[in-house]
Amino acid sequence: MHRGRSASARQERDFRALMDLAHGFMASQVLFAGCALRVFDAAALGPVDAAALARSSGLSPRGTRLLLDACAGLGLLRRRRGAGPRGPAYTNSPLASTFLVAGSPLSQRSLLLYLAGTTYLCWGHLADGVREGRSQYARAVGVDADDPFTAIYRSEAERLLFMRGLQETWSLCGGRVLAAFDLSPFRVICDLGGGSGALARMAARLYPGSEVTVFETPDVVAAARAHFPPPADEDGAEPRVRFLSGDFFRSPLPPADLYVLARVLHDWADAACVELLRRVRGALRPGGAVLLVESVLSPGGAGPTRTLLLSLTMLLQARGRERTEAEYRALTARAGFSRLRLRRPRGPYHAMMAARGGGAGARSDGGGGEATSQTGSGTGREVGAQD
C-alpha cells in the first residue's frame, strides 16, 4: 500500500508538471495580449475594472474580465475585491510596473511584442524546423528569405519594434557586460551590428576616454536617426557615438582597438563566425581584442535551460546556435585570436574577451567604410531577442 500511495503521489506531481509545460504557451499569450492591449499602461494610471477598461479600449466586457483575472492569476496584476456591479479592481504588480508599462525606464514591452509577433509564430513550427534544419519564417510570417534579417525587417514597423526590443534588453544588462572587463585601455571601440546604439552609448558613458563607433546597415542607421535620438546625460551632454554604414560580411571594417560583437555570433554557423572573426581581427590594431557577449552554455552543453531554448530559437530564426565556452574558444582560435577569457556577470548574458594575437589566421579586410558622424544608431544583426 505504501508503495502504491508513493507511486500515485509521484504520478500526480509529474502530471501537474506535464500540464504546466503543456499550457505554458497560454501564459505567454496572456502576457503578450496584456501588452498589446495596453492593459498595464491603463493600470499604471490607477485601479481599473473590467467594464470601464472595456469601454475605454473598445474591448468586449467578457474578454476583458477573463484577461484581467488571468493576469492576476499569473501575478501580473493584483485583484482587489469590489462591491457592486463594477466588480473587482485591478492594479499592476511590481513586475508589471517595472517591465510592462510603456513609459517605465526598464520597460520590456517592445521586446515582448516582437516575441509575440515573430518568435512565437516561428516556434509554432518547431517540429518542421527540427525535420528540415532551417528557419521557419516562410511558414510563420510568409517571408522565405535566405537572410534572416529580411524576414525580421519585413516592414518598417517590424524593424522599429525589433530595434526597440534590443534597446530594452541593454537597458537591463548592458552595463554589466560592459563592466565585466576593464575596457578603458581601448581608445577606439567599434560595436559591430550595434542596434539602436544603446550599448555603444553605455560604453561611451562608462569609458569616456574612448571613441565609440557603431557599424550597421544603411537602412538601420537611417531608422535610428529618425526614431532613436540619444538621451542626454545628467549634465545635459549627449554621449558621442559615431556611425559607419556597411555590411559586416562584405564592407571594409574600420580600424579599432576593440570590437564588440554582442549577441551576433549565435546567429551564424561556425564557418560564418570564423569568417567574421577573421575580418574583425584584420581590422584590429596591434594589442587589440574582441569582446563577445552571448548566453554561454555550461560545459558539455547541458544547460542552462533558457540558453538551450534560445538555441532552438536560432534554429527557427537564424543559422546558428548557442555555444559552450570551449566552442567559442575554438572559433576564436581558428580566426587567429588567443587567450579567450569568460566572465559571468549577473544576468542572462556573459562576456568573453579574446586577444588579437600575432599569428596567422587573419585576412586583412579592415579599412574605411561610409562614415556618418551621428549620435544615433541602427539595429543589430541579432535575432532571438529574449530576456
Curated annotation (Swiss-Prot):
Gene3D superfamilies: Vaccinia Virus protein VP39, Winged helix-like DNA-binding domain superfamily/Winged helix DNA-binding domain. Coiled coil: none annotated. Residues 355-387 are annotated as: Disordered. It catalyses: N-acetylserotonin + S-adenosyl-L-methionine = melatonin + S-adenosyl-L-homocysteine + H(+). Residues 356-370 have a biased composition (Gly residues). S-adenosyl-L-methionine binds at residues 153, 170, 216, 246-248, 263. GO terms for molecular function: acetylserotonin O-methyltransferase activity; protein dimerization activity. The active site is at residue 266. The keyword Membrane does not apply. The keyword Acetylation does not apply. Catalyzes the transfer of a methyl group onto N-acetylserotonin, producing melatonin (N-acetyl-5-methoxytryptamine). Pineal melatonin synthesis is severely compromised in most inbred strains. In many inbred strains, genetic defects in ASMT have been identified. Melatonin production may have an impact on gonadal development, testis development being significantly promoted in melatonin-deficient C57BL/6J x Mus musculus molossinus animals. Belongs to the class I-like SAM-binding methyltransferase superfamily. Cation-independent O-methyltransferase family. Homodimer. This is Acetylserotonin O-methyltransferase. It comes from Mus musculus molossinus. The lineage of its organism: Eukaryota, Metazoa, Chordata, Craniata, Vertebrata. The gene is Asmt.
